[in-house]
UniProtKB/Swiss-Prot annotation:
Family to which the UniProt record says this protein belongs: Belongs to the KdsB family.
Annotated source species: Pseudomonas putida (strain W619)
Pfam families, sorted: CTP_transf_3
An example Gene Ontology molecular-function term: 3-deoxy-manno-octulosonate cytidylyltransferase activity
Main location: cytoplasm
Pathway(s) annotated for this protein in UniProt: Nucleotide-sugar biosynthesis; CMP-3-deoxy-D-manno-octulosonate biosynthesis; CMP-3-deoxy-D-manno-octulosonate from 3-deoxy-D-manno-octulosonate and CTP: step 1/1; Bacterial outer membrane biogenesis; lipopolysaccharide biosynthesis
Any one GO cellular component localisation term in the record: cytosol
Protein name: 3-deoxy-manno-octulosonate cytidylyltransferase
Top-level taxon in the UniProt lineage: Bacteria
Keyword Transmembrane appears in the UniProt entry: no
């Protein structure tokens, strides 16, 4: 029996690094349409775009997507998801996958993977994914979020800083990674149960989440277990900057 889950794609027009990001054209389509098309290839029973901007609603309706208007004052994409789950009337045990609206090349297979991982780990409140890092540039890039997990695959911490900090190795040379240290980049896709989303919103943001601008730290702060698996297919570049946008355009317009 296939797993039933819903994909929600949060899409905000007011990106700090790349304004108007969801509607920027890639190969003749808005970025959010590429994300929606990839999500529709997954096993999700329903794919919904969530936004607080009327122009995004109009654009999404034009290409046939189900789109919901949400409040504009949410602290994070997860808070927005909770409102969507309430609007859709989803039960507490329903699984919702948050697919970022700036991942136009997201592999559908890893959307299925993260939903299945949450279903397989009832001790976890969240499931998410990561991939190995092999170069120091990514480790020191604050736009690449690093994650460290315990022996059971549960997250210990996330950070925009190098994590872990290889004290002795980096004191000598920051241009190469130390042997035997498994650096991993967090892939910003999450699976949740609706009941957890309700708890998440009720807690409100914590100082650690606000300092790093990483919403998953709110969950760790409150003792929630986050299961982290290596993605079975590494996603191509997401779009955080104008340079990322040009790389994705070259890939999709080739």
């Amino acid at each position: 029996m296939s797993l039933d889950f819903t994909v929600v794609i949060p899409a905000r027009l007011r990106s700090t690094r790349l304004p108007g990001k969801p509607l920027l054209l890639i190969a003749g389509k808005p970025m959010v349409q590429h994300v929606w098309e990839q999500a529709r290839k997954s096993g999700a029973g329903r794919v919904v775009i969530a936004t607080d901007d009327a122009s995004i609603v109009e654009a999404c309706q034009a290409f046939g997507a189900e789109v919901l208007m949400t409040r504009a004052d949410h602290e994070s994409g997860t808070d927005r998801l909770a409102e969507v789950a309430a609007q859709l009337g989803l039960p507490a045990d329903a699984i919702v996958v948050n697919v970022q609206g700036d991942e136009p090349l997201i592999p559908p297979v890893i959307i299925d993977q993260v939903a299945a991982n949450l279903a397989a780990h009832p001790e976890a409140g969240i499931a998410t994914l990561a991939e190995p890092i092999h170069d120091p540039e990514t480790v020191f890039n604050p736009n690449a979020v690093k994650v460290v997990s315990d022996k059971n695959g549960l997250a210990l911490s996330f950070s925009r800083a190098p994590l872990p900090w290889a004290r002795d190795a980096f004191a000598k040379d920051r241009n190469q990674l130390p042997q035997g240290v498994p650096y991993r980049r967090h892939i910003g896709m999450y699976a949740y149960r609706v009941g957890f989303l309700q708890d998440f919103v009720s807690w409100g943001p914590c100082w650690l989440e606000q300092t790093e601008a990483l919403e998953q730290l709110r969950a760790l702060w409150h003792g929630v277990r986050i299961h982290v698996a290596d993605a079975i297919e590494a996603p191509a570049v997401g779009v955080d900057t104008a340079q990322d946008l040009e790389r994705v355009r070259r890939l999709l317009e080739a």
